[in-house]
């Protein structure tokens, strides 16, 4: 971090230092822009504690009729995959209504196509991006393996897998013998699997964010460890207000994830952004290493071998930004994981909770703010911020340069809920 007085004019301010903001900052610095990142703790929010997946197959929307049918059962169990905190339910009703509208068949198809348009190239995008940023050593392309113990669970997952195949995702159905050979530590009751060989994962998301920040600073980028509390359009730029003063930026990229809603509204974008609270349990001495990232179809969570242990990550808790964490949701992951991997050492777990920025349709917001082309919005990536960071950075760079993007970004318009 370096000093930056209030009189200093900023060319491009990046509001938010998660993986999306850092990727945008690095790519813009590569393109010759002078960038300043504003974030009190870069790389230590949702980008730090996620499962690390780079998942080109994330093209099956969460909002489906099957999800809606399962909601009553899930909501009756405080430790189910999806939970709504009762105190937050009244505020969530408009979001849930939009979620239900997104579950209609024609919307599921459209949303799936939109996700595929930006997710399918994510591994290739990361390969080039990571090489430039010097973080290639943190990425492993070892695939993603969905595993199921019950035939009815496997059957219930088939519509999502069929949609992935329809979009062009490479999937291989595998049997119990294949599973036992590939993952010998897997419990024998897991008899069914689907392998996505093209997927990748990050072995240390926090270190990857640090690497992007260092690469940006090596290109002249700067960091202010401050939260932006307000923004205001002025004739010659966008005014950023913080607890320690204000700065004028010629242009800004709003990429502060779950904290973007109010700032976006100040730029004319009124979007139903809310928060999916996600949990992880980190096992420092698991006693085993996985040959691929696993997704347990029974417990609906991911298991990722990382540099500092095994990470169990998942669950969705709708409860906003202010309610206290319920770490029983992280602790239950240990029970699920022991059933999946009987030899797993559960000693000394560390628990974490973070905020996924989520729109009801499952699509991020990427595009110019309605009130000004001085502001580009890039937030709401939910479960796939890590996956989509380089692609998002490429789109943002194109927008600020006035170039025609190779991606159709209309589905991600900040005005789509207007």
Q: Which role does the model predict for each range below?
A:
Residues 93-214:
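Rossmann-like flavin
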């Amino acid at each position: 971090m370096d000093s930056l007085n209030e009189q200093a004019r900023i060319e491009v301010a990046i509001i938010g230092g998660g993986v999306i903001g850092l990727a945008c900052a690095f790519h813009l610095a590569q393109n010759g822009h002078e960038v300043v990142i504003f974030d009190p703790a870069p790389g230590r929010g949702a980008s730090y504690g996620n499962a690390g997946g780079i998942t080109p197959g994330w093209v099956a929307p969460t909002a489906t009729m099957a999800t809606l049918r399962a909601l009553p059962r899930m909501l009756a169990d405080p430790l189910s995959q999806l939970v709504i905190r009762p105190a937050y339910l009244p505020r969530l009703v408009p979001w849930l209504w939009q979620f239900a509208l997104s579950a209609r068949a024609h919307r599921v198809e459209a949303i799936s196509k939109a996700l595929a348009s930006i997710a399918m190239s994510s591994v290739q995008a990361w390969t080039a991006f990571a090489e430039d940023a010097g973080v290639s050593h943190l990425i492993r392309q070892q695939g993603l393996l969905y595993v199921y113990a019950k035939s009815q669970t496997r059957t219930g997952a088939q519509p999502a897998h069929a949609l992935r195949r329809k979009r062009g995702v490479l999937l291989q159905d595998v049997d119990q013998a294949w599973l036992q050979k590939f993952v010998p530590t897997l419990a024998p009751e897991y008899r069914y699997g689907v392998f996505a060989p093209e997927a990748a994962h990050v072995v240390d998301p926090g270190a990857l964010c640090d690497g992007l920040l260092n690469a940006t600073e090596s290109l002249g980028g700067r960091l202010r460890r401050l939260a932006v509390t307000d923004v205001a359009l002025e004739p010659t730029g966008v005014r950023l207000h913080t607890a320690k003063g204000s700065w004028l930026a010629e242009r800004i990229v709003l990429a502060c994830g779950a904290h973007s809603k109010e700032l976006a509204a100040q730029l004319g974008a009124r979007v139903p952004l809310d928060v999916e609270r996600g949990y992880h349990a980190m096992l420092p001495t698991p006693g085993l290493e996985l040959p691929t990232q696993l997704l347990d179809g029974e417990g609906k969570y991911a298991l990722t071998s990382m540099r500092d242990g095994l990470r169990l990550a998942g669950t969705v808790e709708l409860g906003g930004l202010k309610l206290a964490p319920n770490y029983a949701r992280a602790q239950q992951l240990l029970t699920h994981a022991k059933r999946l991997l009987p030899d797993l050492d559960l000693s000394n777990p560390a628990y974490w909770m973070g905020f996924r920025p989520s729109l009801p349709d499952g699509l991020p917001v990427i595009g110019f703010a309605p009130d000004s082309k001085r502001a580009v919005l890039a937030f709401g990536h939910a479960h796939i911020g890590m996956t989509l960071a380089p692609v998002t950075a490429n789109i943002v760079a194109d927008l600020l340069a006035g170039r025609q993007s190779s991606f159709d970004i209309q589905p991600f318009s900040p005005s789509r809920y207007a």
